[in-house]
Amino acid sequence: MQIVAVCGSMREESNTNKLVRIIAETSGIDCEFIELGKLNIKPCTGCSVCMMNEGECPIDDDMQAAYDKLLAADGFIIGGPTYFMDISGAVKNFTDRTMALKYRDIGPAYNEDMPWLGTAPFNDKPTVLVVTTAGGYHDRAIESLKLAYDDCHRVRIVDQVAEIVGMNDVDDIPEALERAKAAGKKLSSALQS
């Protein structure tokens, strides 16, 4: 059993990444980390090639290596900071690019019988969403992630951790650390049930 944890902050020791790691460690499940701050992931161009070519995205960048990891995962932790009142651009780019996976192995998807629908390769996979912010709008960022991962990819959200940490280090906020540990336990329980 394996989970994939997306660490969506550009800063390696960010509060977001710390919480994602705590959740992963507490879950006790083998975890593959995708650290967006270390990768070159270009934005989706909206070319629709993935819909016509069985989910193959034509953009040659680090996202190509992430696709197989995502498909093989039994569950997910998706974490990102709130920048300018919503989820960060890095997490949004990554999320947009996961859309290609909805078209894997189904043939051309844009036709009269099934326009734009695709499949749900992440269907019912237990997922924890993580958002941090210095000042607010974490609820909006969580909603953005829920729209993409719950409504579109059909994951099963078992918990969400949305923390206002100000300019503080999350290590100094025991309640936030406890919420992250509780989320890790929920993820573990969901994966083992």
Please annotate each region the language model reported.
Residues 1-104, 167-193:
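N-terminal beta1-alpha1-beta2 submodule of the flavodoxin-like/Rossmannoid cofactor-binding fold
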